Amino acid sequence: MDFAIPTEIQNYLAELDAFIAREIVPLESEHRQYFDHRREHARTNWDDDGKPRREWEDLLAEMRRRADRAGHLRFALPRELGGRDGSNLAMAIIREHLAHKGLGLHNDLQNESSIVGNFPQVHLMHRFGTPAQKARFLDAMITGEEAVAFGLTEPDHGSDATWLETTAVRDGS
């Protein structure tokens, strides 16, 4: 088995690095308080039940806009959603590459934001959503205008998805 990183993925990593240097590092430098020892306080509105501060959310939105405009945010999504049909292998390598760069606006795993979006909920909506749901939510989920949550925990297994006992049966279309 060949464990070498495919050339096209290596080239894409170089493209990402150039984008980060050109677009993200300057933006992050203007907002250091969100990435150093002050980050929890800077990101959190303690007077509003600990919700994220609007300024932090706005910075994440700007990062997503820039990444989307450059063609990175939707990398793993199907072409019909503006993506590049990125593979699981490519995503694993990209995520590892970005994480290795450390804490930053390019990839903040604390709140699952990244210049290369990880969108399992978008894939699910694209595959199983009704036309009305897709029209309302798909693009908004990608851009961060809408958030989606799902329940994973069960009484006997917590959040270990490998032990889920809940099942579903398709009933209708």
Where are these regions (language model features)?
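N-terminal glycine-rich flavin-associated loop
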Residues: 109-132, 158
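Short alpha-helix boundary/capping motifs
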Residues: 48, 122-123, 153
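Glycine-rich, Trp-frequent "lid" loop and neighboring beta-strands that shape
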Residues: 83-84, 128-173
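Amphipathic, small/basic residue-rich leader segments at the start of a protein or domain
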Residues: 1-112, 132-143
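Short beta-strands and strand-loop turn motifs
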Residues: 75-77, 115-118, 149
